[in-house]
């Protein structure tokens, strides 16, 4: 009888320990066999996109970013090289698009350089943005391009303002409309009532970079456009 009580006690302890271990283990984004649209998306962008590799529920192979994580929207936008996640090769975006032929490419670009430096010359902002779109389309005509708005900044941002970002986003939205592309407003869901990036969504003292919770909000917002994105790809 005493032996049975000891055995049951040990069994309970073992089960509790295993249960705790299981609860603390987070599943990887690709652990499930069933995959939805999210698994087909490639995200291209500057530092706010690069940080998705560590903070968003997507596979690292879905992120196209530069080695130093900065991707300037300037005269060299088509020459800048990104790291191809699968091989570690450095390729231009056009070269990567020609090789991988991604079905869907989500572009979020402008915060690292364009928004501030072309704040008084949005025609130049548009010029470089469209140059990038042109080379991608030439390299991979069947890739569905989705233009996502630049994310807002928090109060801590010293140089870039949300007014600058809003004006740049108006340009991006206009480009999308003129080209028949999908424009995703990711800015509004991230803003507080005063128009700043919500404090809980800001991970850096510069007021620019996002937390894991912010990326969750970005992906949930993107899911609202899923039907339209799928229709473009059909």
Residue positions per predicted region:
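Extracellular/periplasmic envelope-modification machinery, especially enzymes
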Residues: 19-29, 56, 60-73, 80, ...
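Conserved SGNH/GDSL esterase-like catalytic core that processes O-acyl groups on lipids
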Residues: 34-127
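A structural signal for isolated positions on well-ordered beta-strands in alpha/beta enzyme cores
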Residues: 42, 106, 144-146, 182
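Catalytic His-Asp segment of secreted/periplasmic serine-dependent ester chemistry enzymes
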Residues: 152-234
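Active-site segments of SGNH/GDSL-like serine hydrolases
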Residues: 108-112, 136-166
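Generic structural signal for well-ordered alpha-helices
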Residues: 129-134, 169
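N-terminal secretory targeting modules
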Residues: 1-44, 48-54, 229-234
């Amino acid at each position: 009888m005493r032996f049975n009580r000891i055995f049951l006690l040990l069994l309970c302890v073992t089960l509790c320990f295993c249960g705790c271990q299981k609860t603390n283990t987070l599943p990887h984004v690709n652990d499930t066999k069933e995959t939805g649209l999210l698994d087909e998306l490639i995200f291209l962008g500057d530092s706010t996109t690069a940080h998705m590799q560590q903070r968003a529920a997507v596979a690292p192979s879905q992120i196209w970013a530069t080695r130093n994580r900065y991707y300037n929207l300037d005269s060299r936008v088509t020459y800048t090289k990104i790291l191809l996640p699968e091989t570690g090769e450095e390729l231009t975006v056009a070269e990567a698009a020609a090789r991988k032929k991604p079905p869907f490419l989500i572009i979020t670009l402008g915060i690292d350089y364009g928004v501030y430096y072309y704040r008084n010359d949005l025609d130049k902002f548009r010029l470089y943005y469209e140059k990038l779109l042109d080379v991608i389309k030439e390299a991979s005509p069947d890739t569905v391009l989705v233009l996502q708005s630049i994310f807002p900044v928090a109060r801590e941002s010293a140089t870039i303002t949300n007014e600058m970002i809003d004006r740049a986003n108006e340009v991006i939205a206009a480009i999308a409309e003129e080209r028949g592309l999908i424009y995703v407003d990711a800015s509004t869901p991230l803003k507080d009532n005063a128009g700043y990036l919500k404090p809980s969504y800001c991970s850096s003292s510069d007021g620019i970079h996002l937390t894991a919770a912010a990326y969750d909000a970005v992906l949930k917002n993107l899911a609202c456009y899923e039907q339209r994105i799928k229709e473009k790809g059909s």
